[in-house]
Amino acid sequence: MNYGTVKFFNDSKGFGFVKDNESGKDYFVHVTGLIDKIKENDEVTFEIKEGNKGPNAVNVKLA
């Protein structure tokens, strides 16, 4: 499990980015990968899953 911070999330478009606290990497997150509703600067936990265009944050929930 990874811990991070929501950098950006657009509710109307259904996607955003989460920054991993340990590695500093940004991961794409799609609305289908959410467990909880998120907004910018929320602290979250997530898993990383390989997607069509690289790694994505999935099972994203508030920490």
Residue ranges: model-predicted function:
Residues 25-36:
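Beta-strand/loop nucleic-acid-binding surfaces
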Residues 34-45:
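Short nucleic-acid-contacting surface segments enriched for D/E, G, S/T with interspersed K/R
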Residues 10, 22, 50-52:
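A generic beta-sheet turn/junction motif
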Residues 1-8:
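Structural detector for short beta-strands of small beta-barrel domains
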Residues 49-63:
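OB-fold/S1-family single-stranded nucleic acid-binding modules
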Residues 3, 26-28, 43:
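Well-ordered beta-strand positions in beta-sheet-rich domains
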Residues 13-18:
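Short aromatic-glycine-enriched beta-strand elements
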